[in-house]
Every structure is written in structure tokens, then in C-alpha cells.
């Protein structure tokens, strides 16, 4: 394979992995530990 193809595939895999981890952190099991500042604020 050419170098440009390998670099493109590597960057694409990193981007997909980072996006998947961000979605898992936002909506998955770790999201239970996140606090909601709007719920903490009293009107």
C-alpha cells in the first residue's frame, strides 16, 4: 500500500475511535457520574 493510504486509514481509525469514546462517555455507563449544572442551580 502507499504511504498516503496508510496515513488516511490511520487518521480515520483514530477519528472513529475518539468519536465512539466520546459518545460512550456522554451516553453510556460513565455518564451516570456526570453532574448536570442546570439541575444543581436553584431558581
From Swiss-Prot:
GO terms for cellular component: chloroplast thylakoid membrane. It is found in: Plastid, Chloroplast thylakoid membrane. The chain crosses the membrane at residues 5-27. Its main location: plastid. Keywords: Chloroplast, Membrane, Plastid, Thylakoid, Transmembrane, Transmembrane helix. InterPro entries: PSII_PsbN. The keyword Transmembrane helix applies. It is a single-pass membrane protein. GO terms for biological process: photosynthesis. The keyword Chloroplast applies. Signal peptide: none annotated. Belongs to the PsbN family. May play a role in photosystem I and II biogenesis. This is Protein PsbN. It comes from Welwitschia mirabilis. The gene is psbN.
